[in-house]
Every structure is written in C-alpha cells, then in structure tokens.
A protein has these predicted regions:
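Active-site and adjacent substrate-binding regions of carbohydrate-active enzymes
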Residues: 1-194
Length: 194
C-alpha cells in the first residue's frame, strides 16, 4: 500500500476471486449470484484477479495464464460482457463492498493488442523478437517504459477502469518505474479520489 493509504483500509477483509475457477460457470454472473454469501463472511473488498482476455500465443497449458493479458481495455468474453462486469460491480457496491481488479502492467501476452499495434513499446531480445527478462515467463512479453507514449496509454486505461472499480492491485509493480506509478496515482485520483 502507498504511504498515504487510509489506515482503515489496512484492516479491511479482502476476498480474492479468479472468475474462471470460482464456479462451474466461470462467469461474472455466477460471482454476482454468490455476493450475499461473500458479504456474510465479513468481506469489505472483492479483489478480482485479471478480468481481461488471455493471449493465445505461447500459452501455459490449454487455458493460459490470466497474467498473459491480450487486451487491457476488454473483459474476457469467457467471463461475460462488459455490461455483465458492470452489473457485477454495481451489485458489489449495492452490498456495501468495494471492488478492485488486478493490473498487470509489466508485461502482456506476445499476441496482445499492444504488441500488434505498438511493438516498439516492448523489450526486445538480441534477435529483435519480443521477449521478457525472466526465462520461465515464456508466455509474456515485457513492456519497455522508456516510451512515454506507453505511459499515456496505460494511465488512460487505468482511468477508464477507475470509473467502474474502486482500486487496483498492481502485479509485479516493482518492475514498472516508480515515477510511472506516482503519475498514475495523481491522474487516477482526478477520476476516483481516494
């Protein structure tokens, strides 16, 4: 947590959900149907693991890792539609809980929207192909934050989601420049204070 995070948040109960494995249906609607039970457990905040589409290229297993994100600005269609996600977040709020989502900004899937449209924003191996700095993460390509246009894109994406959710859990945050996070916090606070 950031230094200026409200102390009361440090004692909140988080309930983590990976939508794909949460129920047999693996959908936003199935999570929504279970919210009363989750609330009764004393939950204050629901933390959703990545909600975005998973890449196809170099998948780990048949389903792939949810941290190999194909499009930061979309929801995984296996989980439902964007409207289904909005309904879930509204239902969470209706029960007095908050919702946070995972933000995976160090890397994407190698066949992501960003890799297709902005390959220059990625780390490249000596042979020129997209790569990552960790050998066992073969299903992802690392982003290169020396490109300020990438900062703009990522911050706009955070602001988009901040209009829906209450906050973010930032995966491998130390691998993304601290200055990026400082700027992102300032800009997101203009959309969702606190």
């Amino acid at each position: 947590m950031a230094v200026d995070t409200e102390k009361t948040l440090r004692n909140q109960v988080l309930y983590s959900i990976y939508v794909r494995n949460y129920s047999e249906a693996g959908t936003f609607a199935a999570v929504q149907a279970d919210l009363d039970r989750i609330k009764a457990l004393g939950t204050d905040i629901i933390w959703l693991l990545p909600i975005h589409p998973t890449g196809e290229k170099h998948r780990k297993g048949t389903l792939g890792s949810p941290y190999a994100i194909r499009d930061y600005r979309a929801v995984n269609p296996e989980f439902g539609t964007l409207d289904d996600f909005r309904h879930l977040v509204d239902a969470i709020h209706d029960r007095g809980m908050k919702c946070i989502i995972d933000v995976v900004y160090n890397h994407t899937s190698p066949d992501s929207w960003l890799a297709e449209h902005h390959p220059e924003w990625f780390f490249h191996k000596p042979d020129g192909s997209l790569g990552n700095r960790f050998g066992d993460w073969w299903d992802v390509a690392d982003l290169d934050y020396s490109h300020k246009e990438l900062w703009e894109y990522q911050i706009e994406t955070l602001k988009y989601w901040a209009r829906l959710v209450d906050g973010f859990r930032c995966d491998v945050a130390p691998l993304v420049p601290l200055e990026f996070w400082k700027r992102a916090r300032e800009e997101v606070a203009a959309v969702r204070p606190g």
